[in-house]
Amino acid sequence: PEELVLTVRAGTALAEIEAELAQANQMLAFEPADLSGLLASKSTGTIGGVLATNMSGPRRLTAGAARDFLLGFDAVSGRGERFKSGGRVMKNVTGYDLSKLMCGSYGTLAVVDEVTIKTLPRPETSLSLLFGCNDMGSAVAKIAAIFASPHEPGAAAILPQNVAVAAGIDMTAAFIVVIRLE
């Protein structure tokens, strides 16, 4: 990935993309969730699946959704016609922005074959803070207080206790607030 732009086939595994980006000290800003640990299964997610569902992870609050990082794509319409939308550079302002429309369409508008996405430099350091909360209201209040503070969290999530336990977090509170500082 050069110039913080990556072009891949839609069926490319997320694990493969993340490994390549890690070598270049880059990352996917929207941080798609890897649910394989929670589901006790092998990670099989693809970048096409992430974009078709617009699945954005805990960094969405600060970085934006997956659709905000799709620069362009090649696809096949329902009539079997190949078409392209967007571009391979950030300064592409011609025509309609079909990229945002395609994200979250679950493949109903076209079959995407290739995507070009914007990447970001990986932070030099990262620290996750965990807070136990006994109810959802206090968990939401904790996140609101942190985002209202002078600190700039990179990601935030609220995990129910059963999900936290499945992820290997040993805390007894009903909800676990996870805040990442970068």
Describe every region a protein language model picked out:
Residues 1-43, 51, 55-88, 93, ...:
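N-terminal glycine-rich flavin-associated loop
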Residues 52, 71-182:
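C-terminal substrate-binding/cap subdomain adjacent to the FAD-binding core in PCMH-type
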Residues 44-45, 164:
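Beta-rich nucleic-acid/ligand-interaction surfaces
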Residues 8, 45-46, 104, 111:
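Short conserved micro-motifs on helix faces and helix-strand junctions that flank
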